[in-house]
C-alpha cells in the first residue's frame, strides 16, 4: 500500500537513461500532462489512455509546433516500456499494456543525399570541421549520432575478413555490434592505432542543428537533411549500388530486415529512373 502512495514522477526521474534523449522527452511530457503530481496508485488504464491522447496533440518541448504522429508513436512506445518495468517490479498491480493500443506510425517521405549531393557536401567547407567529418563518416558507415559521439579509438579493431571495423555497444539498442569500415572512412578520421580517447573529440550534438543546416545550405542542398539522413543515405546508396539487403541490414545493426526495408523504400524510385534512361526516341 505504501508503494502505491509513492511519488511515481520521482521514480520515473531516477529511471532516466542518459544519454537517451527520448526517455527525457517522455518524462517531461508526462510531467506536463499530470501537472507535476502523480502517485503509483494513479497509474491506471484510464490515465494512460488519456496520456496517449495527450501525446497525439502535444506541443514540442523545445520548438514551436506540435510533435509529429511518428514522434508520438515513439514516445508512447517508450512510456509503455516503462509500464512493463513497473509491472515486472510489482510497482503496479495490472499489466496495463494488455489494455493499451499502439499509436500507428505514418509513412512519410524521408530525405537522403544523392551521390552528387554527397560529393557537394564533401567539397563544401564547414565552420565546424569536426561536424563535417562526423557527418561524412556517418554516410560511409551508417553510424548514428549517439554512437559517433561516444566512439573511442580503441573500438576500431581488425576485422576478421580483412580491414578494420567498429566493435562497440550501440547506444540506442545497447547491443554489441561489429560494423566494417572502409579505408576511405579511416582516412577521413585520420586513423592511427596509437590514438586514444574519443574519435570525434569536441563534437557537440547541438551542432547538428543550426551549424549543420548552414553547412548544408552553403553546399546548395535544399532538402530537409538531419543527421539521421546520413544513415538513410548509407542504406539508399548501398541499395542503389546493388549491395544485398541482408548485408546492409547487418552493417546497420538492424535486428529486423523490415527496418532496413523502410530505409530503402526510396531505392525503388531509383530503379524507376533507371528504366527511363533507355529510349528509342531522340531527345
Q: Residue ranges of each PLM-predicted region?
A:
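Basic/aromatic-enriched alpha-helical hairpins
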Residues: 2-63, 82-84, 88
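Basic, Lys/Arg- and aromatic-enriched nucleic-acid-binding interface segment
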Residues: 66-69, 73, 88, 92-145, ...
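C-terminal catalytic core of tyrosine-transesterase DNA break-rejoin enzymes
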Residues: 136, 140, 147, 231-255, ...
Amino acid at each position: 500500500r505504501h508503494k502505491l502512495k509513492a511519488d511515481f514522477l520521482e521514480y520515473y526521474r531516477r529511471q532516466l537513461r542518459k544519454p537517451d534523449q527520448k526517455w527525457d522527452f517522455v518524462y517531461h511530457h508526462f510531467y506536463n500532462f499530470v501537472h507535476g503530481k502523480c502517485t503509483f496508485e494513479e497509474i491506471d488504464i484510464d490515465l494512460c489512455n488519456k496520456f496517449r491522447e495527450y501525446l497525439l496533440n502535444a506541443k514540442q518541448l523545445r520548438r514551436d509546433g506540435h510533435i509529429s504522429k511518428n514522434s508520438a508513436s515513439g514516445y508512447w512506445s517508450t512510456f509503455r516500456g516503462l509500464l512493463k518495468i513497473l509491472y515486472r517490479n510489482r510497482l503496479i498491480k495490472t499489466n496495463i499494456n494488455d489494455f493499451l493500443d499502439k499509436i500507428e506510425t505514418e509513412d512519410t517521405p524521408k530525405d537522403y543525399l544523392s551521390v552528387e549531393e554527397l560529393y557537394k557536401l564533401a567539397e563544401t567547407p564547414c565552420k565546424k570541421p569536426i561536424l563535417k567529418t562526423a557527418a561524412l563518416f556517418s554516410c560511409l558507415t551508417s553510424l548514428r549520432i549517439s554512437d559517433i559521439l561516444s566512439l573511442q579509438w580503441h573500438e576500431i579493431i581488425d576485422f576478421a575478413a580483412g580491414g578494420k571495423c567498429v566493435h562497440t555497444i550501440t547506444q540506442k539498442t545497447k547491443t554489441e555490434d561489429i560494423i566494417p569500415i572502409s579505408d576511405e572512412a579511416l582516412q577521413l578520421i585520420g586513423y592511427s592505432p596509437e590514438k586514444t580517447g574519443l574519435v570525434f573529440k569536441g563534437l557537440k550534438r547541438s551542432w547538428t542543428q543550426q551549424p549543420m543546416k548552414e553547412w548544408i545550405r552553403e553546399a546548395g542542398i535544399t532538402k530537409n537533411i538531419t543527421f539521421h539522413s546520413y544513415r538513410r543515405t548509407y542504406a539508399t546508396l548501398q541499395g542503389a549500388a546493388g549491395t544485398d539487403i541482408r548485408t546492409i541490414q547487418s552493417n546497420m545493426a538492424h535486428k529486423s530486415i523490415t527496418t532496413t526495408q523502410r530505409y530503402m523504400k526510396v531505392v525503388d524510385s531509383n530503379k524507376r529512373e533507371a528504366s527511363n534512361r533507355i529510349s528509342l526516341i531522340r531527345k
